Amino acid sequence: MPAPCNCIETNVCICDTGCSGEGCRCGDACKCAGADCKCSGCKVVCKCSGRCECGKGCTGPSTCKCAPGCSCK
């Protein structure tokens, strides 16, 4: 049975309080939906609506920069 915090084994990255960055082993394929990802190497997902692209320095919903008139989550 794989460890629940091991993203490589489970393909699921638990980014909240349940897992520390040490045991998670998140890789490039791991996606997090929050700005508080505690797993090292975990990529935070930032999505802009429509055909808008995220700006530089976007690490999560709180720092997401989209083009004017575009919403971000």
Swiss-Prot record:
<feature type="binding site">
    <location>
        <position position="48"/>
    </location>
    <ligand>
        <name>Cd(2+) 5</name>
    </ligand>
</feature>
<feature type="binding site">
    <location>
        <position position="19"/>
    </location>
    <ligand>
        <name>Cd(2+) 2</name>
    </ligand>
</feature>
<protein>
    <recommendedName>
        <fullName>Metallothionein 10-Ib</fullName>
    </recommendedName>
</protein>
<feature type="binding site">
    <location>
        <position position="52"/>
    </location>
    <ligand>
        <name>Cd(2+) 5</name>
    </ligand>
</feature>
<feature type="binding site">
    <location>
        <position position="54"/>
    </location>
    <ligand>
        <name>Cd(2+) 5</name>
    </ligand>
</feature>
<feature type="binding site">
    <location>
        <position position="32"/>
    </location>
    <ligand>
        <name>Cd(2+) 1</name>
    </ligand>
</feature>
<feature type="binding site">
    <location>
        <position position="24"/>
    </location>
    <ligand>
        <name>Cd(2+) 2</name>
    </ligand>
</feature>
<feature type="binding site">
    <location>
        <position position="42"/>
    </location>
    <ligand>
        <name>Cd(2+) 3</name>
    </ligand>
</feature>
<comment type="subunit">
    <text>Monomer.</text>
</comment>
<keyword id="KW-0479">Metal-binding</keyword>
<feature type="binding site">
    <location>
        <position position="26"/>
    </location>
    <ligand>
        <name>Cd(2+) 3</name>
    </ligand>
</feature>
<feature type="binding site">
    <location>
        <position position="19"/>
    </location>
    <ligand>
        <name>Cd(2+) 1</name>
    </ligand>
</feature>
<feature type="binding site">
    <location>
        <position position="37"/>
    </location>
    <ligand>
        <name>Cd(2+) 1</name>
    </ligand>
</feature>
<comment type="function">
    <text>The metallothioneins are involved in the cellular sequestration of toxic metal ions.</text>
</comment>
<feature type="binding site">
    <location>
        <position position="72"/>
    </location>
    <ligand>
        <name>Cd(2+) 6</name>
    </ligand>
</feature>
<dbReference type="InterPro" id="IPR001008">
    <property type="entry name" value="Metalthion_mollusc"/>
</dbReference>
<feature type="binding site">
    <location>
        <position position="54"/>
    </location>
    <ligand>
        <name>Cd(2+) 6</name>
    </ligand>
</feature>
<dbReference type="GO" id="GO:0046872">
    <property type="term" value="F:metal ion binding"/>
</dbReference>
<comment type="similarity">
    <text>Belongs to the metallothionein superfamily. Type 2 family.</text>
</comment>
<feature type="binding site">
    <location>
        <position position="42"/>
    </location>
    <ligand>
        <name>Cd(2+) 2</name>
    </ligand>
</feature>
<feature type="binding site">
    <location>
        <position position="39"/>
    </location>
    <ligand>
        <name>Cd(2+) 2</name>
    </ligand>
</feature>
<feature type="binding site">
    <location>
        <position position="64"/>
    </location>
    <ligand>
        <name>Cd(2+) 4</name>
    </ligand>
</feature>
<feature type="binding site">
    <location>
        <position position="58"/>
    </location>
    <ligand>
        <name>Cd(2+) 5</name>
    </ligand>
</feature>
<keyword id="KW-0104">Cadmium</keyword>
<feature type="binding site">
    <location>
        <position position="46"/>
    </location>
    <ligand>
        <name>Cd(2+) 4</name>
    </ligand>
</feature>
<keyword id="KW-0480">Metal-thiolate cluster</keyword>
<feature type="binding site">
    <location>
        <position position="58"/>
    </location>
    <ligand>
        <name>Cd(2+) 4</name>
    </ligand>
</feature>
<feature type="binding site">
    <location>
        <position position="72"/>
    </location>
    <ligand>
        <name>Cd(2+) 4</name>
    </ligand>
</feature>
<feature type="binding site">
    <location>
        <position position="70"/>
    </location>
    <ligand>
        <name>Cd(2+) 6</name>
    </ligand>
</feature>
<feature type="binding site">
    <location>
        <position position="32"/>
    </location>
    <ligand>
        <name>Cd(2+) 3</name>
    </ligand>
</feature>
<feature type="binding site">
    <location>
        <position position="30"/>
    </location>
    <ligand>
        <name>Cd(2+) 3</name>
    </ligand>
</feature>
<feature type="binding site">
    <location>
        <position position="15"/>
    </location>
    <ligand>
        <name>Cd(2+) 1</name>
    </ligand>
</feature>
<feature type="binding site">
    <location>
        <position position="66"/>
    </location>
    <ligand>
        <name>Cd(2+) 6</name>
    </ligand>
</feature>
